């Protein structure tokens, strides 16, 4: 089938781009323009007509990319037209009337590029990450992965395992032949090197995933401490309802922020207190779960009635900031215990010391987001395959004696397969759907 879709964002725009890919792309161009194919990769102005008529849809630029030298590896074209809904719909309708043409699924153009060997799986994922990047650090990470450094590293490790696997399988195929001592030593040396490399890659504090998904901040504290007001201030908009009535927030309210280029997901949670209301109790449990899974906790308490004990005190650690709100109403010094914790006195209502709090948050972000060229993991599936590969290699080393070569070879094959799954070197059909469904239609 030949596929087509709008590749630019929906809505009114000066220019819209409709992509077409497949063996009937030539026919689509000829039928819509009533003219010969444009020169390869040369922007050509053409009148675009409704199918089988001379009624003009629009006048626009056509680009023709013969396969395999195209994004998808197939014959491909782009129609650059005026970006009104009526023009786009008319062009889509005309293409749909051509035999063997259908609307593309989400991410199908990039899926074709992967299947036709134009890109590896890591690059496909990095394209999706670049499209959805909201902050500078997310853009930088997506570009780094797109440039192939991660793929090169994983491919290099896989090739090392393939090399020693060939020696192990040679021993299995020719059991009467003894492997030279230097080859046996080399097998152990290389497998140990790969193990150390994988351990180093995994020891990254999950920075890559944090950058991609966002640094998680949970605002937690007793009722009416000003948690929702703080969320609204950080967001510069009214995200949460603010009320004098205690227990207004029952569910978790999340908002995505960009703080100095760092992606952040801030969660406002239900107030912590003893409650007999079943719905409120569930909200409090959600709040504590968010706190447990957060990268940073903002523990907000009311300066008028400082109640810092029990659960809230237990939550204080190196990943927490004690935020004492309504500090303009504080009529006594803080006790020495509270002063020992990292804290800040603020008043959301009077805009007091909020910049100090934001500065502390930024410092926490910078410490969490210490990036380096060694960050290679950006998704949970990368980490899972590396961990599984590592476990297989450990099993391999335990069996790395001549009499166990049959079993050892299987461990080595599995370790190699898991590394291949990361870049798509082996059959990965079962994960393609989850990856490419995250794309927009037209990409």
UniProtKB/Swiss-Prot annotation:
It is an enzyme of class 3 (hydrolase). It is found in: Cytoplasm. HAMAP family: GTPase_MnmE (MF_00379). CDD domains: trmE, TrmE_N. One of its GO terms (molecular function) is GTPase activity. Mg(2+) binds at residues 228, 249. Exhibits a very high intrinsic GTPase hydrolysis rate. Involved in the addition of a carboxymethylaminomethyl (cmnm) group at the wobble position (U34) of certain tRNAs, forming tRNA-cmnm(5)s(2)U34. One of its GO terms (cellular component) is cytoplasm. GO terms for biological process: tRNA methylation; tRNA wobble uridine modification. Homodimer. Heterotetramer of two MnmE and two MnmG subunits. This is tRNA modification GTPase MnmE.
């Amino acid at each position: 089938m030949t596929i087509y879709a709008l590749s630019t964002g929906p809505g009114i725009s000066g220019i819209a781009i409709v992509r077409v890919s497949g063996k009937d792309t030539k026919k689509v161009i000829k039928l819509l323009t009533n003219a010969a194919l444009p020169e390869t990769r040369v922007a050509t102005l053409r009148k675009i007509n409704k199918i089988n008529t001379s009624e003009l849809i629009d006048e626009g630029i056509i680009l023709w990319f013969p396969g395999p030298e195209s994004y998808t590896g197939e014959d491909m074209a782009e129609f650059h037209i005026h970006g009104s809904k009526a023009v786009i719909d008319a062009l889509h309708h005309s293409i749909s009337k051509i035999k063997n043409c259908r609307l593309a699924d989400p991410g199908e153009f990039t899926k074709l590029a992967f299947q036709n060997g134009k890109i590896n799986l890591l690059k496909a994922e990095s394209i999706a990450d670049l499209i959805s990047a909201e902050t500078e650090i997310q853009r930088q990470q997506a570009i780094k992965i797109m440039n192939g450094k991660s793929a090169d590293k994983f491919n290099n490790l896989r090739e090392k395992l393939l090399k020693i696997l060939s020696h192990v399988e040679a021993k299995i195929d020719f059991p009467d032949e003894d492997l030279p001592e230097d080859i046996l030593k080399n097998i152990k040396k290389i497998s140990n090197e790969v193990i150390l490399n994988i351990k180093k890659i995994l020891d990254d504090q999950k920075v890559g995933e944090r950058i991609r998904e966002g640094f998680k901040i949970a605002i937690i504290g007793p009722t009416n401490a000003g948690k929702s007001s703080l969320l609204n201030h950080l967001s510069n908009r009214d995200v949460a309802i603010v009320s004098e009535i205690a227990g207004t927030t029952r569910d978790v309210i999340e908002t995505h922020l960009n703080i100095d280029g760092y992606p952040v997901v801030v969660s406002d949670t239900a107030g912590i207190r003893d409650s007999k209301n079943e719905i409120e109790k569930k909200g409090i449990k959600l709040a504590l779960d968010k706190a447990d899974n957060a990268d940073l906790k903002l523990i907000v308490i009311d300066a008028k009635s400082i109640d810092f004990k029990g659960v809230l005190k237990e939550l204080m650690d190196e990943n927490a900031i004690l935020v004492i709100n309504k500090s303009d109403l504080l009529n006594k010094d803080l006790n020495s215990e509270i002063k020992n914790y990292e804290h800040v006195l603020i008043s959301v209502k009077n805009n007091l010391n909020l910049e100090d709090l934001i500065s502390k948050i930024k410092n926490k972000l910078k410490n969490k987001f210490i990036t380096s060229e060694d960050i290679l993991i950006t998704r949970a599936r990368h980490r899972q395959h590396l961990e599984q590969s590592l476990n297989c290699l450990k099993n391999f080393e335990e069996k790395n004696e001549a009499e166990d070569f049959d079993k050892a070879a299987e461990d080595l094959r599995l370790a190699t397969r898991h590394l291949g799954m990361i870049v798509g070197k082996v059959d990965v059909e079962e994960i393609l759907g989850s990856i490419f469904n995250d794309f927009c239609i037209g990409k």
